[in-house]
Every structure is written in structure tokens, then in C-alpha cells.
């Protein structure tokens, strides 16, 4: 099983509001970036969307070290998700995305790690920039329509 590093970030201009997500996949010297945006979303949805989209980009089962500045994502993936499944997500938010995460994550071995935001962590800073730019772009496009 290949060992992949994934770095993710989500951004929301107002919470809720225009949001963006981004990821960096790294395998040895290979690196791939991805990003996107939504018009009406939250920061937590964008954090989770970055993770989901990064996993969709993988072509085979992998062992993954996932790095995010969202403590909620780290704890959800490493600790809480199994309990949520057993309780059928009762009282939880973003159930649609968590169910999608489960579907795209099931073939991988994933361990999530927290990195401090805005602390000079190169990949986290890059994801932050990409996610924020995606959110700003969709906000500008929306302004132009109105």
C-alpha cells in the first residue's frame, strides 16, 4: 500500500457564506493540488469537502497521513466517527458529507494529524491560500451576476 500525505484546508468568508476548499496530495516527489468553492456553505463543510475531494483523487487504496488545521476534523476522523455511525448520526451536522466521506475513505487507512494554522507550515499555508482564493472568486462571480 502506498503511503500518501494529504494536506487540506477549508475557508469561509462569512460563516455561513461563500466558501472554498483545497488539498495537496503528495507521494514521494509527486504532488497534486485541487481546490473548489461553494456559494452557501460553512467552514466545517469546506474542511470536510477538502478531505473528500482529496480522497476522490486517489486511484488505489492507500495508507494516508492527513494533515489539517481543523481539530474538529482530526477528532471526528480519529475518534468520533465510529460512534456517530452506530448512533446513525443522531444530532450531528453535515451528515451528507460524512456519509460521502465514509464511502470514499473505506478502501484507505487514514490517520489524521492536526497542524497549527497560520504558523508557517508550508503545505497548510498553500491550502489556505488556494481555499481562500476559491471562495473569493465565487463571491466575485456572484456579485457580477447581481
From Swiss-Prot:
Binding positions for Mg(2+) 1 per the UniProt entry: 9, 47, 69
Gene Ontology terms for molecular function: magnesium ion binding; nucleic acid binding; RNA-DNA hybrid ribonuclease activity
Keyword Nucleus annotated: no
GO biological process per UniProt: DNA replication, removal of RNA primer
Residues the record lists as binding Mg(2+) 2: 9, 128
Occurrences of domain RNase H type-1 (ranges): 1-136
Protein name as it appears in the record: Ribonuclease HI
Originating organism: Campylobacter jejuni subsp. jejuni serotype O:2 (strain ATCC 700819 / NCTC 11168)
